[in-house]
């Protein structure tokens, strides 16, 4: 899109080259942009340390950095911090082929057991928003009323377990689930995997596992290097996983439900859901 007069998402500035932005004469707004410069110079870097060094040595005035990213660079000079919204979503995914987590009622119960506000505030340092629905709470189509019906509630969690006939049947401290295909009950146990490249995601996944185990689950968290993590997702070698995705700006979820989707793991492909995404 560099060669286009108005590349998508260029806003008040347009790319003239890899290292230079200039005022966009075709900008759709009549108001003056937030910054009043005729041009903005860009600095190309390859490493996180180069981002840090260029900023600390005042070679650049502004950097975009994600405190929750594995590539986050910490800065030691004085600076002003602005919060920029993004469509990055962290979430818990399930293996629909798991003998335990194939149970819809059990998965629904977990929705009420995760304190998203705590994770966003205390683990992500406030650089995240708690969202029950798979979109930003600031999005115009985010249904707050609907989201509130699925928010953190241990009372609703227990009610959902009862509806799914999940209980500690042998009184050993671990919840049990009757599996009709097996003809007997099995413990609500399994393995959650998370990529070890991000300390923040490992910490968040640990919080989820600990919270569920305190409620009667028997989950094990397994951290994996990126290549091993991807392999486990692609082969379905997991019960749950803690993931992250940068969604499109309209929060399109089709990559999860298309059989060829980039995020379709654990038998999640669903033509009905895919059609809903495409409407």
Please give the residue ranges for each predicted region:
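Short, well-ordered beta-strand elements
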Residues: 11-14, 19-20, 37-44, 186-196, ...
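Ligand-site clamp/hinge motif
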Residues: 26-73, 218-220
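Periplasmic-binding protein-like
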Residues: 80-95, 265-275
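Append "and occasionally in soluble cytosolic enzymes with long acidic Gly/Pro-rich linkers
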Residues: 20-23, 102-210
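Ligand-binding "clamshell"
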Residues: 71-83, 236-237, 250-264
